[in-house]
């Protein structure tokens, strides 16, 4: 309720005027930013700044122990460092070794306990000189993130601090060789680029996904997510006395007991445990979508005894030893029996807790999982990084499994230790087994969700609000160039050399997945004013890897959240236009060390301001990777739009009998009306089956019968169960809708000319089977015509601007030459009306009365197509039919940069979508220009996020900011896909499902060729 009141207050202040004013750093913050940069430069060498190096070497931490909140820990740790009884420098740090975890935790607590900034700086310099590099990096970063006097300081990207952990060891070796040649005067080049192709040894399937799994931006993101699990609020770190049993129970367990007693704060239900599960579900869903885009099936189940996943990372630690890898067939039974049994035991205990509904605390208290805090409890148990209610019994499943599956060799001496990538938070996402492991973790999460009551019609309905249509501009992915500074591995560079830039600069050149910025438009009718409505947008698969339609309710774990925002709805018609770059929970590219340094230096010299970057603007998921890689002919997905009230959610928590165990007898299952269900909720409980189990209830709304016949998302609730003919993949034939064989029609989104067969999407008007057959015949004729045209075509550049017609569903057949199309907004009179043809010149004859495009000019003399007419006033249409991949694209899309066209239609201004031009391509990428982009250095004007997003994160601990999880109204993360959805829930008018295609433009892989 407290959060609801705050939300209403923000709405009253005008959430529709969302821009956040940038704040410039003062001199104090600039100095601190300078200190952090210098302490993290060339971390395996002495500090380049001689003043800091001398400070660290001369500081006597023991004699200054009174300057810390816990002097006993200072004396204990400093004595161990002086005696050489801590991890030495030059060896690789990993959380898998208990002693190393202890040392880094003590250092973190010391840094956090420094009473003032100067003491903190001296301690950091001392640790930088005397402590292991990996331990220092983790403790120092965590302390800067947590301390109040270092807020708004940002770090260099982890792949520039430790490039050895992210780039192939051969690239690192080449950079070091270049540095040696420079010192010998054999190389006078000032700027040297080393092309990087991801060369980890992977299976064939995983190699296709290397653009995602080996992405260094993804690794940097997950490094922070992993670190956040070990960061606790500052007041919890300063315990000077051991906790009594009563204090322990109150601090760790008490908040959950209060929830059971009815003291509920909806926003407080979203803690680290819930975020841990949600962020990993989202990461896994993105990986699954990219698998699907590449024609691969679901993630394979992991076997703790026999691991089938080839991986040789070709990465190395500071000691020069390469990280451990795995052969294709790894037998662990003979060498890791004890660890295998331990991991299996932890998993069984978690499954038992989910099935029984209760977690046992060290005091013998049974704590229910089926309560508002249940998600937090379960997530904390699985992660096991200090928040678990019973760490002795439940351990840390994810940490133990990483150690097992990583296959690092057992050693007795730290100098010989080489951890696996899986054990290092900053590179774990590079290992394919990471995703197999987290599929098992997500299976636990889904097992828990299946025992929660499903969302019903009453739970999701927003009375009087109807989403009439959703238009999405073109979704196009591409590979863009990126450069990584390798200064950390290219020898010592003095501060004077840094300032004068006298040494040559060695950088790695990579290609990374990105996408063009896009917009979407939501047409909403509301019968009354609805202040502070929350709009959530998800993206998920339309078909499985075999081409069969999926059920959203049964596959909600495969959907990713693209956007969330507050919208005031007024009575009548509402048109919402949203820019992809405004989305919260996503971050632009991380600024490089040199960019940060230049910004600080310029601000110190008063040349230009150094703007403060908020944590949520830099620690969220990479915006570049928010869309899965598209396909030349279009990758079919679903856009799911949900509008909900900002009122608190009132739903039961069960547990209910899972579907696989339900007999549907009357004592277990009942169908009730909307009114009956509302009465049951108002009474505070659903009927009990017995033993604390709630009865399974399904609501029958009045519109369900029609929805089962007309709404494809509702029809697909049963997925492929009632489909007579199975579809094929990838996208070469239309999937027969659920219920095929009845006297029915279905919608067709577009007919595209495809190199290997035609593809029919679904959207727009209802077409009969006969019409579809006619369309397919036309498609074959057009393919023959296009083949002749292609013989004389030449390559051209694309620019972009979207031209939209009426608000009703778009209609028409599409024949495209690239991820762009012209589409008629007129009502179809026949199969061929609205045919979109791009780049075909006059003289093409054969197909008649295809109204939709006029004045399109290109290659002459092709016989077979005639009378293509329609869109007028579009100067500058690209000449010639090019790259005829045959994508059918919904929306009236015209390539970026074209002039305004069809009179009477609605045009989306090109200025609403900002981006960065990719050199030599004429295309625009969005990763660098996402809202909150650092310093506005990439383009002007800078897109900014809504004010309410900053308000949301303002008072949260940093561990709950990192990762980008957000719920503006306090509902569960991922709502309403945090639970299964009933048929009635899918039929509410404030939920809309839109079919979309994601295209890929440019080179098909991220390889760099010379």
Curated annotation (Swiss-Prot):
Main location as per UniProt: secreted
Post-translational modification comment from the UniProt entry: May undergo further proteolytic processing.
Domain Hemocyanin C-terminal: 455-648
Free-text tissue specificity from the UniProt record: Expressed in the fat body and secreted into the hemolymph (at protein level). Present in trophocytes and oenocytes of the fat body (at protein level). Present in the ovaries of workers and queens in oocytes, nurse cells, follicle cells and their precursors during oogenesis (at protein level). Not expressed in ovary or testis. Expression levels in the fat body are higher in queenless workers with active ovaries compared to queenright workers with inactive ovaries; this does not translate to higher protein levels in the hemolymph.
GO molecular function, one term: nutrient reservoir activity
Subcellular location: Secreted; Nucleus; Nucleus, Nucleolus; Cytoplasm
InterPro entries: Di-copper_centre_dom_sf (IPR008922), Hemocyanin/hexamerin (IPR013788), Hemocyanin/hexamerin_mid_dom (IPR000896), Hemocyanin_C (IPR005203), Hemocyanin_C_sf (IPR037020), Hemocyanin_N (IPR005204), Hemocyanin_N_sf (IPR036697), Ig_E-set (IPR014756)
Cellular component terms (Gene Ontology): endocytic vesicle; extracellular space; nucleolus; nucleus
Induction: In 5th instar larvae induced by juvenile hormone. Post-transcriptionally repressed by miRNA-34 and miRNA-210 but not miRNA-317. Induced by a protein rich diet or repressed by a diet lacking protein.
Record-annotated Hemocyanin N-terminal domain positions: 30-151
Keyword annotations of the record: Cytoplasm, Glycoprotein, Nucleus, Secreted, Signal, Storage protein
Signal peptide start and end residues: 1-16
Domain annotation Hemocyanin middle: ranges: 157-445
Glycosylation sites: 197
Task of the protein: Storage protein that may function as a nutrient supply to compensate for lack of dietary proteins during metamorphosis and egg production. Has a secondary role as a nucleolar protein that may be involved in oogenesis.
Family according to the record: Belongs to the hemocyanin/hexamerin family.
Subunit structure: Probable homohexamer.
Name by which UniProt lists this protein: Hexamerin 110
Organism annotation: Apis mellifera (Honeybee)
């Amino acid at each position: 309720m407290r959060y609801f009141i705050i939300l209403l207050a923000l709405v009253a202040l005008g959430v529709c005027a969302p821009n956040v004013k940038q704040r410039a750093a003062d001199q104090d913050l600039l100095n601190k930013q300078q200190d952090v940069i210098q302490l993290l430069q060339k971390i395996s060498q002495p500090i380049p700044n001689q003043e800091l190096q001398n400070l660290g070497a001369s500081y006597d931490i023991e004699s200054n122990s009174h300057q810390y909140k816990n002097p006993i820990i200072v004396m204990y740790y400093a004595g161990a460092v002086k005696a050489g009884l801590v991890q030495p420098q030059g060896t690789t740090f990993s959380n898998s070794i208990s002693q190393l975890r202890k040392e880094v935790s003590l250092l973190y607590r010391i840094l956090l306990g420094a009473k003032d900034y100067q003491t903190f700086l001296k301690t950091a310099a001392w640790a930088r000189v005397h402590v292991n590099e990996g331990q220092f990096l983790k403790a120092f970063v965590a302390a800067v993130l947590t301390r109040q006097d270092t807020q708004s300081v940002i770090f260099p990207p982890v792949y520039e601090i430790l490039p050895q952990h992210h780039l192939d060891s051969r690239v690192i070796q080449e950079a070091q060789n270049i540095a040696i040649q420079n010192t010998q005067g054999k190389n006078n080049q000032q700027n040297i680029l080393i092309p990087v192709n991801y060369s980890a040894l992977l299976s064939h399937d995983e190699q296709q996904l290397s653009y995602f799994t080996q992405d260094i931006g993804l690794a940097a993101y997950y490094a922070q997510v992993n670190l956040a699990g070990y960061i606790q609020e500052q007041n919890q770190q300063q315990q000077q006395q051991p906790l009594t049993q009563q204090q322990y129970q109150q601090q760790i367990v008490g908040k959950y007991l209060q929830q059971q007693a009815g003291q509920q704060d909806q926003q407080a239900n979203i803690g680290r445990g819930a975020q841990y599960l949600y962020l990993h579900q989202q990461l896994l869903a993105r990986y699954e979508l990219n698998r699907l885009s590449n024609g691969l099936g679901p993630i394979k189940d992991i076997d703790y005894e026999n691991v089938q996943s080839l991986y040789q990372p070709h990465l190395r630690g500071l000691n020069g030893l390469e990280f451990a890898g795995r052969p294709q067939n790894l037998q662990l039974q003979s060498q890791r029996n004890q660890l295998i049994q331990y991991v299996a035991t932890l998993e069984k205990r978690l499954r038992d807790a989910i099935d029984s509904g209760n977690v046992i605390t060290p005091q013998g208290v049974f704590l229910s999982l089926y309560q508002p805090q249940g998600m937090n409890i379960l997530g904390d148990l699985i992660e096991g990084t200090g928040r678990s209610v019973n760490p002795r019994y439940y351990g840390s499943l994810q940490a133990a499994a990483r150690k097992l599956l990583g296959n690092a060799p057992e050693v007795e001496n730290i100098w010989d230790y080489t951890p696996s990538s899986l054990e290092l938070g900053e590179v774990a996402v590079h290992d394919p087994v990471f995703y197999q492991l987290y599929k098992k973790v997500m299976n636990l999460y889904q097992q828990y969700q299946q025992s929660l009551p499903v969302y019903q019609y009453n739970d999701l309905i927003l009375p009087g609000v109807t989403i009439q249509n959703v238009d999405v501009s073109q979704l196009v992915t591409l590979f863009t160039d990126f450069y990584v500074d390798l200064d950390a591995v290219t020898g010592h560079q003095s501060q004077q050399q840094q300032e004068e830039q006298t040494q040559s600069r060695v950088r790695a050149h990579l290609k990374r997945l990105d996408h063009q910025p896009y917009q979407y438009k939501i047409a909403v009718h509301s019968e009354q004013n609805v202040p502070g409505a929350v709009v959530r947008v998800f993206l998920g698969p339309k078909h499985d890897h075999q081409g069969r339609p999926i059920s959203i309710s049964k596959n909600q774990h495969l959907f990713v959240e693209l956007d969330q925002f507050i919208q005031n709805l007024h009575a009548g018609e509402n048109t919402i236009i949203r820019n992809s770059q405004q989305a919260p929970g996503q971050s632009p590219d991380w600024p490089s060390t040199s960019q940060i340094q230049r910004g600080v230096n310029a601000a110190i010299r008063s040349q230009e301001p150094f703007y403060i970057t908020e944590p949520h603007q830099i620690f969220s998921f990479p915006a570049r990777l928010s869309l899965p890689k598209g396909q030349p002919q279009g990758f079919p997905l679903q856009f799911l739009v949900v509008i909900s009230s900002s009122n608190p959610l009132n739903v039961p928590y069960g547990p209910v009998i899972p579907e696989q165990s339900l007999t549907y007898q009357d004592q277990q299952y009942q169908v009730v009306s909307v009114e009956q269900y509302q009465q049951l909720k108002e009474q505070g409980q659903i009927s009990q089956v017995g033993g604390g189990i709630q009865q399974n209830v399904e609501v029958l709304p009045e519109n369900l019968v029609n929805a089962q016949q007309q709404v494809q998302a509702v029809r697909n609730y049963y997925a492929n169960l009632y489909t007579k003919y199975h579809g094929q993949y990838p996208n070469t034939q239309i999937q027969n809708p659920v219920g095929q064989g009845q006297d029915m029609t279905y919608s067709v989104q577009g007919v595209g000319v495809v190199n290997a067969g035609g593809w029919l999407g679904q959207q727009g008007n209802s077409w009969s089977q006969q019409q579809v057959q006619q369309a397919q015949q036309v498609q074959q004729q057009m393919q023959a015509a296009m083949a002749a045209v292609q013989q004389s075509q030449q390559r051209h550049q694309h620019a972009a601007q979207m031209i939209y017609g009426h608000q009703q569903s778009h209609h028409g057949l599409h024949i495209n030459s690239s991820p762009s199309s012209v589409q008629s907004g007129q009502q179809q009179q026949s199969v061929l009306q609205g045919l979109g043809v791009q780049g075909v010149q006059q003289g093409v004859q054969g197909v008649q009365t295809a109204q939709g495009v006029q004045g399109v000019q290109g290659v002459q003399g092709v016989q077979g197509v005639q009378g293509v007419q329609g869109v007028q006033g579009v100067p500058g249409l690209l000449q010639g039919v090019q790259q005829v991949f045959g994508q059918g694209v919904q929306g009236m899309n015209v390539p970026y940069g074209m002039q305004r066209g069809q009179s009477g239609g609605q045009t989306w201004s090109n200025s609403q979508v900002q981006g960065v031009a990719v050199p030599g391509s004429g295309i625009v990428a969005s990763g660098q220009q996402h809202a909150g982009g650092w310093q506005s250095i990439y383009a002007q004007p800078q897109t900014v996020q809504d004010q309410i997003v900053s308000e949301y994160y303002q008072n949260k601990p940093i561990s709950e900011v990192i990762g980008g999880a957000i719920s503006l109204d306090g509902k569960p993360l991922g709502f309403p896909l945090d639970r299964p959805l009933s048929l009635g829930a899918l039929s509410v008018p404030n939920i809309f499902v839109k079919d979309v295609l994601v295209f890929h433009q440019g080179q098909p892989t991220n390889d760099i060729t010379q």
